[in-house]
Amino acid sequence: MACSTLPKSPKDKIDPRDLLIPLILFLSLKGARSAAPGSSPHQVYNITWEVTNGDRETVWAISGRLYVSGRDPGLTFGIRLRYQNLGPRVPIGPNPVLAD
């Protein structure tokens, strides 16, 4: 049984976090293991999202645990996106080759 949590985006445009849903489904299917008779594996995948410095830095984290007897083969995976100031935008203008 897989479970995922995604916070709602405050923005109306497409949010890159929505692209992580296929990744969660892949992890859920890949991490599925056959359970012993009378028991079931409990998979839990959570996504946390955090914005620091306004919209300048975005952090995603995926953590998962598979509750089985013995050693826990859990995982932690993180993505960090930082926006950099590339300086003032300079207009390029139309391509002169296309004007012909």
From Swiss-Prot:
Q: Does the keyword Iron apply?
A: no
Protein name, entry field? Envelope glycoprotein
Cellular localization per UniProt: Virion membrane
Q: Name one GO cellular component term.
A: membrane
What's one GO BP annotation on this UniProt entry? fusion of virus membrane with host plasma membrane
SUPFAM superfamilies membership: ENV polyprotein, receptor-binding domain
Signal peptide positions on this chain: 1-34
Q: Other comments?
A: This protein is synthesized as a Env-vMpl chimeric protein. The sequence shown here corresponds to the Env homolog fragment of the chimera. The Env homolog part of the chimera has an internal deletion compared to other retroviruses Env sequences.
Can you tell me which residues are glycosylated?
A: 46
Keywords (alphabetical) are: Fusion of virus membrane with host cell membrane, Fusion of virus membrane with host membrane, Glycoprotein, Host-virus interaction, Membrane, Signal, Viral attachment to host cell, Viral penetration into host cytoplasm, Virion, Virus entry into host cell
